[in-house]
A protein has these predicted regions:
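Positively charged, structured surface patches that bind polyanionic biopolymers
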Residues: 1-86, 90-95
């Protein structure tokens, strides 16, 4: 069984606040979106690579019902997802 480590500082992290502000949601909601996405990634992106994963898939994985492009861009801008030089995406500091 896979597990996910969530640091106690997540709830007060500036990246969480930044993403929450961009999406116009409260920080606890943003934390839920992130944890849902990370739990999905354990099985569906185990290396952290998001190549071939669309913004719509990221949105569904996070259980976000807003604009998928906005969520993906927000996660990149806030630093939760890294965009490599070749345009592929990776979950920041995954494993």
């Amino acid at each position: 069984m896979a597990w996910l480590q969530v640091h106690q500082t997540l709830k007060d992290h500036r990246k969480l606040f930044d993403a929450a502000d961009q999406l116009e949601v409260e920080p606890p909601h943003m934390m839920g979106l992130l944890v849902s996405f990370w739990l999905w990634a354990l099985d569906n992106a185990p290396t952290g690579s998001l190549s071939d994963i669309t913004p719509r898939m990221i949105s569904r994985a996070a259980q976000w019902d807003g604009d998928p492009e906005k969520l993906a861009k927000t996660l990149i801008r806030a630093g939760w997802i890294d965009e490599k030089e070749d345009g592929t995406l990776e979950i920041h500091d995954w494993y």
